[in-house]
């Protein structure tokens, strides 16, 4: 089962936390839809800033949006001008007052989502898929990952029949619940169609009585 299920969803409450942290009763549907709109809007607008993930915490009529980015300077802008502009745009999408918090991803080379997006960018630039996969795998190990698995699925190399190819180095123990595994997925839009890229990175084990591993 560990091979099939999302590794982050499987570890919620063990060594992973929810990306949306709020409670709603009758307004659950509208708030969930708001979260999806906020995430979709930010991902599209701030793609070049290297967005790893977005956490949303809600209180009464307030929503705190934590944006984890590899290049926070692009989001903040000169003297924080871009932040204010972004806040107003998000308040048009949401019915709550928005508080934006930008957090830097210090090691984007071992962040699964950013690695997947890096491979996607290379594929869109017509880099050979095996070369792109291998380069990212070796870079992740160099920056301290204990293990990494990358898989690409689609019309690889312009082949007529779609297939899946994967590359793994080190350990990626999907059945071990105490293992700190990061997961990322994106799609590359190539001339031959879409190619799905999935990345799993193993950062080490979170042992009982020990604090959660420091995030990249």
Swiss-Prot record:
GO function terms (MF aspect): mRNA binding; rRNA binding; structural constituent of ribosome
Keyword check for rRNA-binding: yes
Gene behind this protein: rpsC
Cellular component GO terms, alphabetical: cytosolic small ribosomal subunit
Protein's name according to its UniProt entry: Small ribosomal subunit protein uS3
Swiss-Prot/TrEMBL GO biological process terms: translation
Entry keyword annotation includes ATP-binding: no
SUPFAM superfamilies assigned: Prokaryotic type KH domain (KH-domain type II) (SSF54814), Ribosomal protein S3 C-terminal domain (SSF54821)
Domain KH type-2, residue spans: 38-106
Assembly and binders: Part of the 30S ribosomal subunit. Forms a tight complex with proteins S10 and S14.
Keywords: Ribonucleoprotein, Ribosomal protein, RNA-binding, rRNA-binding
């Amino acid at each position: 089962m560990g091979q099939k299920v999302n590794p982050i969803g499987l570890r919620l409450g063990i060594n992973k936390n929810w990306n949306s942290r709020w409670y709603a009763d009758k307004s659950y549907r509208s708030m969930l839809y708001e979260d999806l709109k906020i995430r979709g809007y930010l991902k599209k607008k701030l793609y070049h800033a290297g967005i790893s993930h977005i956490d949303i915490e809600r209180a009464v009529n307030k929503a705190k949006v934590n944006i984890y980015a590899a290049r926070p300077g692009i989001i903040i802008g000169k003297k924080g001008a871009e932040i204010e502009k972004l806040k107003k745009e998000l308040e048009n999408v949401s019915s709550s007052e928005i508080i934006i918090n930008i957090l830097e991803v210090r090691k984007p080379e071992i962040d699964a989502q950013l690695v997947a997006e890096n491979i996607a960018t290379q594929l869109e630039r017509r880099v050979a898929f095996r070369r792109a996969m291998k380069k990212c795998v070796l870079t992740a190990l160099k920056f301290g990952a204990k293990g990494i698995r990358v898989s690409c699925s689609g019309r690889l190399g312009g082949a007529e029949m779609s297939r899946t190819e994967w590359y793994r180095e080190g350990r990626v123990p999907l059945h071990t619940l105490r293992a700190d595994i990061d997961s990322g997925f994106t799609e590359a839009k190539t001339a031959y169609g879409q190619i799905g890229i999935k990345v799993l990175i193993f950062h080490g084990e979170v042992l009982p009585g020990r604090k959660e591993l420091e995030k990249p």
